[in-house]
Each structure stands twice: as C-alpha cells, then as structure tokens.
C-alpha cells in the first residue's frame, strides 16, 4: 500500500490511526508507536525527532532520557519522557494504564511534542510505525490490527 509520507506538518489536517495489541503476562517487552519527524523530507536514514508512544510494557525497562511531566492526550494519561538516543531527540509518552485497543490522531502527539521540541509546521512527518520490542520472552505479544492515514 502506498504512502503520502513525508508530508509537511503544516499541511496535515489529521492523521487517524488505530491499533489492537495482544499482551502476554510474561517476559520483558514494550508495545509502542514510533512517529518520526525531520526538518527535511527524508525517506531514509535517521530522523531528527522520534516520538514513541508506549501503550504498555512489562519488566524493568524504560524509555531513554528522564521523565519531564504528565499529560492527557485524547482521554489517555501518560508520563512524558525526554532524551536522546545519541542519534536523534526522543520523546516518549508512557501510558499510566495499559492500552490494548485505541483509535486516535497521531497529530495530537506531534502537537504536544512541538510544545517542548523544535518541531514547526515546516517540518515533515516521515513515518508512523507500530510495533513490539521484546527484550526477553514475550511469547503471545502481537498486533491484531493496525491502520494509519494522513489527511
């Protein structure tokens, strides 16, 4: 399926997405979205800004950086982490309660991140990915459905 990314942030009306995860009760893992942005319309390489949304995690793992506050986005509560992974700025939103199924607008997270990072309307949304990061075990971890669209 084709994509209309990269797209300039200021030209995006909405970016609806939905996910349905399956979570095991064992292992060390996280289930997250990665939203990538850059000041240029990149299609390869490392982007300047990564936004991670941790829907759920298990074990003693955490995002890079340190917690900088709390926020509510589209009715869900998150602890916000800010840091760098050595290649780009990384902002992570860690859900305070597990989220298994959710439909939301990616731009809600882009807009919130732009209040703390140098993202402007002239930057580009380059990718939206959903996935799983099993650190150990994680049998049963899965995605039943995922969709994303940029309007």
From Swiss-Prot:
Catalytic residues (positions): 50, 133
One GO BP annotation of this record: beta-glucan catabolic process
Stored Pfam families: Glyco_hydro_12
Alphabetic keyword roster: Carbohydrate metabolism, Glycosidase, Hydrolase, Polysaccharide degradation
Known EC number: 3.2.1.-
UniProt key word tRNA-binding: no
Gene Ontology MF terms: cellulase activity
PANTHER family listed in its UniProt record: BLR1656 PROTEIN, XYLOGLUCAN-SPECIFIC ENDO-BETA-1,4-GLUCANASE A
Family under the similarity heading: Belongs to the glycosyl hydrolase 12 (cellulase H) family.
Function of the protein: Probable cellulase. Can hydrolyze barley beta-glucan in vitro. Could be important for the survival of M.tuberculosis in the environment, perhaps in amoebal hosts.
Protein name: Probable cellulase Cel12b
């Amino acid at each position: 399926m084709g994509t209309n990314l990269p797209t300039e942030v200021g030209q995006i009306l909405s970016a609806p997405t939905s996910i349905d995860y399956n979570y095991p009760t064992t292992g060390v893992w996280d289930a997250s979205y990665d939203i990538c942005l850059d000041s240029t319309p990149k299609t390869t390489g490392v982007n300047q800004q990564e936004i991670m949304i941790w829907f759920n995690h298990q074990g003693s793992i955490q995002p890079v950086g340190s917690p900088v506050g709390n926020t509510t986005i589209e009715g869900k509560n998150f602890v916000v982490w800010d840091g760098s992974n050595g290649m780009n700025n990384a902002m992570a939103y860690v859900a305070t309660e597990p989220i298994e199924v959710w439909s939301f607008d990616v731009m809600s997270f882009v807009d919130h991140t732009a209040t703390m990072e140098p993202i402007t309307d002239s930057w580009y949304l380059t990718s939206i990915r959903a996935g799983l990061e099993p650190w150990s075990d994680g049998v049963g971890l899965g995605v039943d459905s995922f969709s994303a669209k940029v309007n």
